[in-house]
Swiss-Prot record:
GO process terms (BP): cellular response to gamma radiation; cellular response to ionizing radiation; cellular response to UV; cytoplasmic translation; DNA damage response, signal transduction by p53 class mediator; positive regulation of DNA damage response, signal transduction by p53 class mediator; positive regulation of intrinsic apoptotic signaling pathway in response to DNA damage by p53 class mediator; positive regulation of translation
Disordered: annotated span: 1-21, 122-145
SUPFAM superfamilies linked to this entry: Translation proteins SH3-like domain
Cross-link (Glycyl lysine isopeptide (Lys-Gly) (interchain with G-Cter in SUMO2)): K136
Family: Belongs to the universal ribosomal protein uL24 family.
Quaternary context: Component of the large ribosomal subunit. Interacts with DHX33.
Purpose of the protein: Component of the large ribosomal subunit. The ribosome is a large ribonucleoprotein complex responsible for the synthesis of proteins in the cell.
Protein name: Large ribosomal subunit protein uL24
A UniProt-annotated Pfam family: Ribosomal_L26
């Protein structure tokens, strides 16, 4: 059910916005979930993928292969290229195979100060969400008086 009258649910409009999205919005769309260990550590579910992150493919033809580094994030095609995920062309050269970021799990993040800030911000907002709607002990005591 639609709640916000200013957000469209028209399929053609959503597809248009997806395929004509500018680069800074494509970055957000191209997010990948974090592995269970990283999720526990940072209290964050997913992050926009970037070059030099280590990922594991969990869906499709190349799933279950060893962990590889992200070589390139190709925002125009909505794909990422991973170190060991390659195939041989008819003329014998090897090329990277494009994989959608939603089909991989991030196993190691390349951290810099900006990315750490993003992780802290996301974890903080998640913590606020967990406490939302819960009464504190003091307020319960005041209500009972």
């Amino acid at each position: 059910m639609k709640f916000n009258p200013f957000v469209t649910s028209d399929r053609s409009k959503n597809r248009k916005r997806h395929f004509n999205a500018p680069s800074h919005i494509r970055r957000k769309i191209m997010s990948s979930p974090l592995s269970k260990e990283l999720r526990q550590k940072y209290n964050v579910r997913s992050m926009p993928i970037r070059k030099d992150d280590e990922v594991q493919v969990v869906r499709g033809h190349y799933k279950g292969q060893q962990i590889g580094k992200v070589v390139q994030v190709y925002r125009k095609k909505y794909v990422i290229y991973i170190e060991r995920v390659q195939r041989e062309k008819a003329n014998g050269t090897t090329v990277h195979v494009g994989i959608r970021p939603s089909k991989v799990v991030i196993t190691r993040l390349k951290l810099d100060k900006d990315r750490k800030k993003i992780l802290e911000r996301k974890a903080k907002s998640r913590q606020v969400g967990k406490e939302k709607g819960k009464y504190k002990e003091e307020t319960i005591e005041k209500m009972q008086e």
